[in-house]
Amino acid sequence: MHCPFCRHPDSRVVDSRETDEGQAIRRRRSCPECGRRFTTVETAVLAVVKRSGVTEPFSREKVIRGVRRSCQGRQVDDDALNLLAQQVEDAVRATGSAEVPSHEVGLAILGPLRELDEVAYLRFASVYRSFSSAEDFEREIQALRAHREVPAQS
């Protein structure tokens, strides 16, 4: 790794620690040339494969933007959206794959969104699952009600 101060092409790792709940590694480095220290953070790149075949990096911001549209007019704050995006990223990373189809990202959004706000969930699901009739909404509402009743019976 190049030193950001003197551009020397090598550096020595002084300390390494996991951060971000094991999703990243923070390394403290020292430059043998100028002696200055600096920190780097390493994360595994997670790519999303779109339907068209195009690959792009996973983006929490993109998840938040998509979910925010579904939450318009609802009492959902930014902290809740950030937490949802983190849950989605954790679920997608848990697959162990470096490349994940966009379809799986959508599936990973549905669960946490259902728990966050049912109306936003219905809005998102209607687009994600391409609802084309009132019956599609009715089926999804029935599934929501059934999901609500299952934990109560436990």
UniProtKB/Swiss-Prot annotation:
One of its GO terms (biological process) is negative regulation of DNA-templated transcription. The keyword DNA-binding applies. One of its GO terms (molecular function) is zinc ion binding. Binds 1 zinc ion. Residues 46-136 form the ATP-cone domain. Keywords: ATP-binding, DNA-binding, Metal-binding, Nucleotide-binding, Repressor, Transcription, Transcription regulation, Zinc, Zinc-finger. A zinc finger (unnamed) spans 3-34. Negatively regulates transcription of bacterial ribonucleotide reductase nrd genes and operons by binding to NrdR-boxes. This is Transcriptional repressor NrdR.
